[in-house]
């Protein structure tokens, strides 16, 4: 935990919001759902990879987790996304854009805005799969 605490000033200096830092340190919603309703894998232009797992019951997202290979920016954006969509209808979740994730987080460093785009496009990909199956 001491090592994690040492990361805080570095992340702050890079421009991560306090909320984003907490998501990074707590690894919020990182992991796999064993039998998700739907999942989607997507790769960003930087090479980062995100896999999103959703449990959907009666068109409501009841559980959301993700796995990733990438940077702290992706971790913050994906954690924020999963928190934002829990309890949402699939129709409302489908409307989430990268700008919504950035606002929810209180900002990411400008060079990490593409991470929010990767998170939002991975969600759209998962929901497209869901809609095609239902």
What do the predicted segments below correspond to?
Residues 1-134:
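Domain-level signature for proteins that mediate thiol-based redox and metal-cofactor handling
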């Amino acid at each position: 935990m001491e090592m994690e605490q040492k990361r805080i000033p570095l992340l702050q200096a890079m421009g991560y919001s306090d909320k984003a830092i907490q998501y990074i340190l707590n690894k919020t919603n990182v992991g796999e759902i064993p039998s998700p309703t739907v999942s989607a894998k997507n790769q960003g232009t930087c090479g980062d990879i995100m896999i999103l797992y959703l449990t959907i019951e009666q068109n409501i997202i009841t559980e959301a987790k993700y796995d990733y290979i990438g940077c702290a920016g992706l971790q913050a954006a994906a954690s924020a996304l999963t928190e934002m969509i829990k309890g949402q209808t699939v129709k409302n979740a489908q409307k989430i854009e990268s700008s919504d994730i950035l606002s929810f987080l209180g900002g990411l460093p400008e060079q990490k805005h593409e991470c929010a785009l990767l998170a939002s496009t991975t969600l759209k990909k998962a929901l497209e799969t869901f809609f095609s199956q239902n």
